[in-house]
């Protein structure tokens, strides 16, 4: 009986061993031989290649780390090579796979100097070029599962797969092994699994670039797919494929014979298989549960219904937004934002304002957005923040930058805007090498577009919005150089008082601020009108308001300088020299006149934006005589003349004293 019991144990052991061994057999997938360069069988290169392959498949190779590179010979017959095993396989599986790939390499590519071989558990590569620590994405291959996605539209399926795969790519690029897996839900009944891996000798950025290219090459019209590139691989499928081949060879063990009668044999013969099946069942669900906890999760591009594809075509112009817009329909997933901005990589930083930093973000489908990461001293709670975002998102006009949505994650508050490609107006306006791209005709259209955008905020939108920080840096230019006003509504979103006429916290940029706002915190639509006037003068002159400094005993800024030219009857001296003779004097003089009306000290004297738009579009409208501007700065000569009434002066207007270090209104 004991021999029978031993036989049963040996049978079970051999069955399990053979099952495991069969699962471990390296599975060939694909190879690529470069036919551009070859070698002869008896050449030095052939000898060096065999030396290299022997080194990579030796007993002392780095199977425990799953990666090794090597070099053999000297130029011009030098060979460089490497192997890479899947990040979660055991050293035994890695060694077995590399041994097989080395043995088969010379038969698959008998005379080619450069080749790459892909197996389920490993990859082998060699070349006559230096391929070590070098990104290579040429000569890849894409494979697909034969079945179509189940009850999911293709664009939605693509979104569901791309986002977690790109997040896994970021995780892999930041890890030492350059390897990561993920699991995500396709629907309530089905999950998908993903895996990405680079060669560990790549830099973090090269690894991420390679994986993103690999992931984006997939068509995502099947339930599973994989891409092989020389420097990286990616795969997704509807089963947990990355756990099929990660078990090492079992340790040898000999069952001990037991004693007993027929009942013992029957019990053992029945209990052992049942026990084995039960243990396998428990192990399966334990692993499944553990994997569920540690995966980077089911992360659709958005937490709710909105799809990434919906932000690719923002409306050119609408009246007052969409009444069905809700906070939920605008909410982005934080991990999607992190992935789109490459973890807020400094190279993606577009700028920084008073409310936070702005980054360029690119979603896997290629959609680009501007991501504003708000400062953490916002006065809003989450609910209030969401409500204000909904209000601002409804403000849609062709001369306003569209707010696409927001994101909340812990202390993080993020706004997502449409991406405007041509940077801001100040980038072109104040750079002598770029000014030529903005001739007068184009600048005149920009002035009109800005005016229409502000008019919409003041009058045509459902709620009156006062910008409070209108400046050249907040005017973005689209691909056709059309202006789009940015950062409107930030006072509402940031939790600042927008309904009262006074505020203790003044936000904005000095030089653009109206006197009553800068000094006393009093703001109104006329505060924006003042800023618009300063902006028009900058557009006409190509100079910053603050660029004029104390020279030859005079103290000046652009507003003061313009007023003096106007008073002296020589406003044409303000015109940007880059225009040459390509402008209409009457048109440009009218713009200067309108700007001076906007920067008058008394807010009641300034025109409304509605009147300004009419002045710009209808040349027959007579313009009022402008009064002295706010923040008018006196020269030393003017101060002396005012101190000595006996001097012969032309008292055009009354001017209060001010200094360049302590600017004050009249």
UniProtKB/Swiss-Prot annotation:
Keywords on record: ATP-binding, Glycoprotein, Kinase, Membrane, Nucleotide-binding, Phosphoprotein, Receptor, Repeat, Serine/threonine-protein kinase, Signal, Transferase, Transmembrane, Transmembrane helix
Residues with the Phosphothreonine modification: 509
Protein kinase domain span: 344-623
Domain of life, source organism: Eukaryota
Reaction equation(s) it catalyzes: L-seryl-[protein] + ATP = O-phospho-L-seryl-[protein] + ADP + H(+); L-threonyl-[protein] + ATP = O-phospho-L-threonyl-[protein] + ADP + H(+)
Residues at the active site: 469
Its EC number(s): 2.7.11.-
GO cellular component: membrane
One Pfam family named in its UniProt record: PK_Tyr_Ser-Thr
Cytoplasmic side: 286-666
Record-level Gene Ontology MF annotations: ATP binding; protein serine kinase activity; protein serine/threonine kinase activity
Positions of modified residues (Phosphotyrosine): 417, 517
Signal sequence extent: 1-23
Residues annotated as domain Gnk2-homologous: 27-131, 137-241
Extracellular side stretches: 24-264
UniProt xrefs under InterPro entries: GNK2, GNK2_sf, Kinase-like_dom_sf, Prot_kinase_dom, Protein_kinase_ATP_BS, Ser-Thr/Tyr_kinase_cat_dom, Ser/Thr_kinase_AS
Similarity comment: family membership: Belongs to the protein kinase superfamily. Ser/Thr protein kinase family. CRK subfamily.
PANTHER family per UniProt: CYSTEINE-RICH RECEPTOR-LIKE PROTEIN KINASE 13-RELATED, RECEPTOR-LIKE SERINE/THREONINE-PROTEIN KINASE SD1-8
Protein name listed in UniProt: Putative cysteine-rich receptor-like protein kinase 20
The species this protein was found in: Arabidopsis thaliana (Mouse-ear cress)
Chain's gene name: CRK20
